[in-house]
């Protein structure tokens, strides 16, 4: 379950307000009819500066209190920025990282604007090797026991297109295999758009 999110004006939005975060979490428990959540995922932290502020403030105090009381079992964080994610992993405060992993995103350097991940301009120049910050992040998570849950394994479907940043269409199995073989990766949320993509995802188990 996400922490630091609210449903407002018909939209799912990020918040950094402790009172809103607590109210939203309590409402989620009521809706689910439960008294605990396995992972409390702090939503969308994409800069080292924001992580530092959050980790030293009341939101982290609240997350730690939830964990200590058993109302969440693990603290997680979602991010698109390897530098922010690495700072979180190395802090010892998080147990789980939700991070965008695929063969194309891994070529790009850290950026606080996640829109660069799916911008054509980002792939216009030569990109030959994995970004060292991303490589360092995966290795650190493996070493520190921080499990990675992958998002955007298919790049929102972009990697399956002939206009893929890879220069040709990749298959669902190729994208899943890439993500699942990165260090520390425990699971992948495929994010399918079609029944066919869902069937291909399920078929990976027997590929």
Which residues are covered by each model-predicted region?
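Short loop/turn segments at strand-loop or loop-helix junctions that form parts
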Residues: 2-4, 42-43, 153
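Beta/alpha (TIM)-barrel catalytic core signal, keyed to glycine-rich beta->alpha loops juxtaposed to Asp/Glu
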Residues: 45-207
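Beta-strand segments within the central parallel beta-sheet cores of soluble alpha/beta enzyme folds
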Residues: 1, 38-41, 77-78
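Active-site groove signature of glycoside hydrolases
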Residues: 27-50
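Short, well-ordered amphipathic alpha-helical segments that serve as non-catalytic structural scaffolds
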Residues: 18-29, 62
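Residues in well-ordered alpha-helical elements
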Residues: 19, 35, 195-196
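Generic anion/oxyanion-binding catalytic loop in active/binding sites
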Residues: 10, 26-29, 187
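Active-site mouth loops of central-metabolism enzymes
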Residues: 3-22, 48-52, 160-169
């Amino acid at each position: 379950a996400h922490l630091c999110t609210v449903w407002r004006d018909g939209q799912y939005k990020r918040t950094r307000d402790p009172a809103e975060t607590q109210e939203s979490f309590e409402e989620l428990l009521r809706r689910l009819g439960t008294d605990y959540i396995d992972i409390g995922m702090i939503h969308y932290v994409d800069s080292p500066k924001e992580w530092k502020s959050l980790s030293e403030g009341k939101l982290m105090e609240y997350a730690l209190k939830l964990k200590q009381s058993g109302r969440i079992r693990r603290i997680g964080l979602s991010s698109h920025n390897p530098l922010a994610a690495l700072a979180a992993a190395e802090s010892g405060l998080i147990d789980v990282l939700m991070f965008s992993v695929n063969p194309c995103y891994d070529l790009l350097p850290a950026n606080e604007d996640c829109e660069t991940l799916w911008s054509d301009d980002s792939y216009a120049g030569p990109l030959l090797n994995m970004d060292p910050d991303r490589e360092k992040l995966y290795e650190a998570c493996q070493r520190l026991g921080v499990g990675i849950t992958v998002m955007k394994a298919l790049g929102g479907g972009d990697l399956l297109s002939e206009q893929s940043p890879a220069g040709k269409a990749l298959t669902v199995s190729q994208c899943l295999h890439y993500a699942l073989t990165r260090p520390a990766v425990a699971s992948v949320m495929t994010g399918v758009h079609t029944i066919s993509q869902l069937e291909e995802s399920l078929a990976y188990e027997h590929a």
